[in-house]
């Protein structure tokens, strides 16, 4: 083989080796950095742009795609200890002609975290309303989507600000009062009774606890490498004290059943999506909501746990699209009558 050709392969091999070695080093030494790069990459790939908006001295961080049009904008509220990027797996399957807005909930990721902030569900609803007003998102009624804690906030928001919301999608929402507690809730009550807030299952501080949380929240058993588990923990640990404070606030007497107390005030067309194998919030909550909300459609997903957005993103996106189409067509037909 010609020496120049050999040199070419050596140079090419060396050039390729640099990014490969950088990736391996990141994976082994800085897995949390790799996770941040992953989200950045997916936002860029899906056309989601990150922006900031302020209400007085309070900062909201959000991502968006598209512009307001004749179809309702979609505002998406994430769950406890998550962030706006949790919706990316669903965004992937949503049409690009929809105006999407995913906001970091109060105290999460790029949104202001203040020791003076009211973290109750009512407090969060007021903050989200401030965000909506800042963006003038309620210039025309929008479609509101929320999951878990975000679902609780979304439901209460629709009850408090009915003129803002054209339709509602609640994905396994928190905030309902069950006749009997499931194993997860029983465990939480035991921890509250013993004041062992360090052991809340939804606030992991080791890779092992992170793995347990993933098993609790999902029916699908994801095989997550140890380094990625470590990275997920590393990203969360600096925020765990805040998560504990928030958790104690949303399970307090003031907030615990706030969706239950307001569900009969929800008047907009509503879609409920719930995983049948949810171990965190029992699927019977869907029936409770359906009995209290007049115009309500329930979708129960087989072989799916609490992390509906992570486990069934394509199905979730399709259900949202189909529901929006049915509501939109009904509204158009009413205008023609």
From Swiss-Prot:
Q: Please report any disulfide bonds recorded for this protein chain, giving both cysteine positions.
A: none
Q: Superkingdom of the source? A: Eukaryota
The yes or no answer to whether the keyword Lipid metabolism is present is yes
Q: How does activity depend on pH?
A: Optimum pH is 7.2-9 with 2-arachidonoyglycerol as substrate.
What compartments host this protein? Late endosome membrane; Lysosome membrane; Mitochondrion membrane
Q: Does the keyword Lipid metabolism apply?
A: yes
Q: Which residues lie on this side of the membrane: Cytoplasmic?
A: 30-337
AB hydrolase-1 domain ranges (all copies): 72-313
Task: Write down the chemical reaction(s) this protein catalyses.
Answer: Hydrolyzes glycerol monoesters of long-chain fatty acids; 1-octanoylglycerol + H2O = octanoate + glycerol + H(+); 1-decanoylglycerol + H2O = decanoate + glycerol + H(+); 1-dodecanoylglycerol + H2O = dodecanoate + glycerol + H(+)
What ranges are annotated Extracellular (topological domains)?
Answer: 1-8
Topology in membrane:
Single-pass type II membrane protein
Biological process GO terms, please? Answer: acylglycerol catabolic process; arachidonate metabolic process; long-term synaptic depression; lysobisphosphatidic acid metabolic process; monoacylglycerol catabolic process; negative regulation of cell migration; negative regulation of cold-induced thermogenesis; phospholipid catabolic process
Q: Which keywords does UniProt give here?
A: Endosome, Hydrolase, Lipid metabolism, Lysosome, Membrane, Mitochondrion, Signal-anchor, Transmembrane, Transmembrane helix
Q: Where are the transmembrane segments?
A: 9-29
A family per Pfam:
Abhydrolase_1
Alphabetized GO MF terms: monoacylglycerol lipase activity; phospholipase activity
Q: Which InterPro entries match?
A: AB_hydrolase_1 (IPR000073), AB_hydrolase_fold (IPR029058), AB_hydrolase_sf (IPR050266), Epox_hydrolase-like (IPR000639)
Q: Which residues bind (9Z)-octadecenoate?
A: 80, 149, 306
The positions flagged as active site in the entry are 148, 278, 306
The EC number on file is 3.1.1.23
The protein's predominant localisation is membrane
A GO cellular component annotated for this chain's UniProt record is: late endosome membrane
Entry similarity comment:
Belongs to the AB hydrolase superfamily.
Q: What does this protein do?
A: Lipase that preferentially hydrolysis medium-chain saturated monoacylglycerols including 2-arachidonoylglycerol. Through 2-arachidonoylglycerol degradation may regulate endocannabinoid signaling pathways. Also has a lysophosphatidyl lipase activity with a preference for lysophosphatidylglycerol among other lysophospholipids. Also able to degrade bis(monoacylglycero)phosphate (BMP) and constitutes the major enzyme for BMP catabolism.
Q: What is this protein called?
A: Monoacylglycerol lipase ABHD6
Q: Please name the source species.
A: Homo sapiens
């Amino acid at each position: 083989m010609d020496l120049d050709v050999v040199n070419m392969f050596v140079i090419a091999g060396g050039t390729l080796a640099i990014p490969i070695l950088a990736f391996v080093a990141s994976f082994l030494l800085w897995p949390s950095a790799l996770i941040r790069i992953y989200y950045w990459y997916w936002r860029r790939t899906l056309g989601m742009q990150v922006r900031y908006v302020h209400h007085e001295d309070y900062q909201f961080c959000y991502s968006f795609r598209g512009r307001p049009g004749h179809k309702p904008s979609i505002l998406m509220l994430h769950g406890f200890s998550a962030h706006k990027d949790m919706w990316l797996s669903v965004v992937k399957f949503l049409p690009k002609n929809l105006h999407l807005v995913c906001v970091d909930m109060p105290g999460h990721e790029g949104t202001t975290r203040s020791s003076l902030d009211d973290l109750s569900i009512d407090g969060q609803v007021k903050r989200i309303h401030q965000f909506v007003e800042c963006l003038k998102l309620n210039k025309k009624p929008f479609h509101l989507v929320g999951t878990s804690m975000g679902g609780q906030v979304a439901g209460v928001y629709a009850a408090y600000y009915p003129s803002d919301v054209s339709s509602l999608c609640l994905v396994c929402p928190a905030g309902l009062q069950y006749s009997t507690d499931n194993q997860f809730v029983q465990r939480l009550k035991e921890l509250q009774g013993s004041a062992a807030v360090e052991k809340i299952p939804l606030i992991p501080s080791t890779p092992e606890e992170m793995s347990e949380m993933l098993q609790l929240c999902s029916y699908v058993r994801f095989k997550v490498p140890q380094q990625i588990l470590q990275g997920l923990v590393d990203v969360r640990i600096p925020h765990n004290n805040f998560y504990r404070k928030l958790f104690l606030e949303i399970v307090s007497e003031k907030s615990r059943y706030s969706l239950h107390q307001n569900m009969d005030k929800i008047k907009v067309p509503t879609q409920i999506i719930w995983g049948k194998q949810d171990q965190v919030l029992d699927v019977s909550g869907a029936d409770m909501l359906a009995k209290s909300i007049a115009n309500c459609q329930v979708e129960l997903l087989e072989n799916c746990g609490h992390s509906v957005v992570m486990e069934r993103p394509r199905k979730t996106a399709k259900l949202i699209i189909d529901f929006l189409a049915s509501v939109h067509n009904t509204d158009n037909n009413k205008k023609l009558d």
